[in-house]
């Protein structure tokens, strides 16, 4: 069980990091970060296509020998822990801040403050962020949302906003390389850059 939790969390860290750094994965994940509030409802604001994009990452578990039932159970428990991180009610948790992704660490992850962008990708263990240099402590007041906040509460518009941006970039791209980067480049990337 312990090895299953650690492995799931390690894979989740990389899946989540890619979801912030690869355009088409950001298009899937962006609506979760578009809320300018932080509460438990944000945990429910999940990507419509998220389960599909997780398959290539998490199919590794049974392929390398982990029991699928134990993997699924550990995944559910890990997800429930992630839900608890979406709150402002719980402040800092002392020594647990060094081991677990606490609500404080996850608030940082949802911040659009410059010092908080692309930080704290872990779900259960904060150690991956510490090891891979993506950790940040909650120091300043967190400004929630994305850099260019959406100006709507319409879930369909929020879900497809970045897909439309990618399509427009694709239409304007001059080279094959730029057309490919429209989907696999960094979210802030634009053609001819």
Please name every model-derived segment:
Residues 1-144:
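Membrane-embedded catalytic scaffold of the fatty acid hydroxylase/desaturase
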Residues 141-193:
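Cytosolic-facing loops and C-terminal tails of multi-pass membrane proteins
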């Amino acid at each position: 069980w312990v090895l299953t939790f650690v492995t799931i969390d390690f894979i989740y860290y990389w899946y989540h990091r890619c979801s912030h750094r690869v355009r088409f994965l950001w298009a899937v994940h962006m609506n979760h970060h578009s809320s300018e509030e932080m509460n438990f409802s944000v945990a429910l604001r999940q990507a419509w296509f998220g389960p599909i994009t997780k398959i290539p990452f998490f199919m590794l578990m049974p392929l390398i020998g982990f029991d699928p039932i134990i993997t699924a159970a550990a995944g559910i428990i890990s997800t429930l822990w992630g839900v608890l991180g979406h709150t402002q009610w719980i402040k800092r948790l002392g020594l647990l801040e060094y081991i677990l992704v606490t609500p404080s660490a996850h608030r940082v992850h949802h911040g659009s403050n410059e010092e908080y962008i692309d930080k704290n990708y872990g779900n259960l263990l904060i150690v991956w962020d510490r090891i891979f240099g993506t950790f940040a402590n909650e120091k300043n007041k967190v400004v929630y949302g994305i850099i260019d906040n959406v100006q709507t509460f319409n879930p369909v518009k929020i879900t497809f906003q970045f897909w439309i941006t990618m399509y427009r970039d694709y239409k304007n791209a001059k080279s094959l390389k730029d057309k490919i980067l429209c989907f696999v480049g960094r979210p802030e990337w634009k053609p001819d850059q």
